[in-house]
Amino acid sequence: MLMPRRMKYRKQQRGRLKGATKGGDYVAFGDYGLVALEPAWITAQQIEAARVAMVRHFRRGGKIFIRIFPDKPYTKKPLEVRMGKGKGNVEGYVAVVKPGRVMFEVAGVTEEQAMEALRIAGHKLPIKTKIVRRDAYDEAQ
């Protein structure tokens, strides 16, 4: 699972998922990308499930770029515990994803393989996604 090696503070406040993404909104490394259309917290387990699905679809060959990283800790109180008495323990880590963010990119495979792999990966995520292609405009940047 992806998680930060060290953190200055163990727990964070939740924050808000407002507005569009600031950066990371174009295909930078691969030929095809999977873009988020909704705001969400994507857990480390969901990122790993999408990655494994793509790797299995490619069998051999192809390169996968994961453009999001779960660096935000989320906490949960134990079952049957009354409210109060402090914030719960860290349960896992999430990546904060806003609309327009490129989450995964693939390279080194045919268009059909890339489209199918990204479609399968999109089904592993709790948000609506779309597949984008690197075009001439992106290469000029």
UniProtKB/Swiss-Prot annotation:
One of its GO terms (cellular component) is cytosolic large ribosomal subunit. It comes from the Bacteria. Keywords: Ribonucleoprotein, Ribosomal protein, RNA-binding, rRNA-binding, tRNA-binding. InterPro entries: Ribosomal_uL16, Ribosomal_uL16_bact-type, Ribosomal_uL16_dom, Ribosomal_uL16_sf. Pfam families: Ribosomal_L16 (PF00252). Transmembrane segments: none annotated. GO terms for biological process: translation. CDD domains: Ribosomal_L16_L10e. One of its GO terms (molecular function) is structural constituent of ribosome. This protein binds directly to 23S rRNA. Interacts with the A site tRNA. Part of the 50S ribosomal subunit. PANTHER family: 50S/60S RIBOSOMAL PROTEIN L16, LARGE RIBOSOMAL SUBUNIT PROTEIN UL16M. Belongs to the universal ribosomal protein uL16 family. This is Large ribosomal subunit protein uL16.
